[in-house]
């Protein structure tokens, strides 16, 4: 039995969820990659009843035991009420909500407060400073790749985040914005900062980003100037430059000053 074709808004009810949970594999609701099951795929549904959401989180231990499911895919949801966010917060593991175009401060707080796992909300294109300040209460990665710009308030909030942050939608970052984002550079070691949408850096911006205490992802940069390479060589953890197409001898010398294994890709290829 395959997934039905989407013709109208589909609300996931308790009755439908019970059928899915009985054998999600038969109903093609398991998301897998290279034969490894990693998520319960409910992307078909654009809404979920509160009763169904409660049943879902209560069933997680059985799903994990039987199917090793830890990730919940709800990318069809277009709205997130505070009540639903409170329930989904109880899901231990990753949650994908990439269909959301916006999120209220209350819902952001309810979803993220002490939540144990990554949260994907890549569909959001605008985020208030208040919402940003609540999202940082999550205890796993935050994926916000739909954001093209960030307010100073949001940047300041994210500087306090102790976990991984993905902002791959940003295509520009001024040195002042980088200062705001990295200002708490002595905070506990975070997982990483993804800025793969940046294709070039000014020297002042590179100097600021190098102060970030965690792994720094800059895979959108294809050509690294010598002075930028020198600045980034001072980065404090692993530096990801997987988009590099060429590297001058001088730039390579600068990057080789970092400890072995802290630059990706391996510089022997340049």
Positions of predicted regions on the chain:
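Extended repeat-based scaffolds of very large eukaryotic assembly and lipid-transport proteins
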Residues: 1-41, 51-52, 57-60
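The leucine-rich repeat
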Residues: 16, 49-52, 81-84, 104-107, ...
């Amino acid at each position: 039995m395959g997934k039905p074709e989407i013709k109208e808004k589909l609300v996931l009810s308790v009755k439908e969820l019970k059928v899915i949970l009985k054998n999600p594999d038969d109903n093609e609701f398991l998301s897998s990659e290279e034969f490894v099951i990693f998520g319960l795929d409910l992307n078909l549904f654009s809404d979920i009843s509160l009763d169904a959401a409660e049943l879902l989180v209560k069933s997680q231990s059985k799903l994990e035991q039987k199917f090793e499911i830890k990730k919940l895919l709800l990318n069809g949801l277009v709205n997130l009420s505070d009540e639903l966010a409170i329930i989904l917060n109880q899901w231990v593991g990753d949650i994908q909500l990439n269909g959301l175009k916006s999120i209220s401060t209350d819902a952001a707080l309810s979803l993220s407060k002490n939540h144990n796992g990554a949260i994907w909300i890549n569909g959001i294109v605008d985020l208030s400073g208040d919402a940003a300040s609540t999202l940082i209460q999550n205890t796993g990665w935050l994926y916000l790749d739909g954001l093209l710009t960030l307010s100073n308030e949001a940047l300041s909030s994210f500087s306090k985040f102790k976990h991984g942050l993905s902002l791959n939608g940003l295509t520009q970052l001024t040195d002042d914005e980088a200062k705001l984002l990295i200002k708490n550079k002595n905070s506990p070691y975070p997982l990483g900062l993804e800025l793969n949408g940046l294709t070039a850096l000014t020297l002042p911006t590179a100097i600021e980003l190098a102060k970030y205490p965690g792994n720094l992802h800059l895979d959108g940069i294809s050509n690294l100037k010598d002075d930028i390479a020198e600045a980034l060589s001072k980065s404090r953890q692993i530096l990801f430059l997987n988009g590099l197409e060429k590297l001058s001898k001088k730039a390579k010398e600068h990057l080789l000053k970092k400890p072995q294994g802290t630059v990706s890709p391996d510089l022997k290829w340049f």
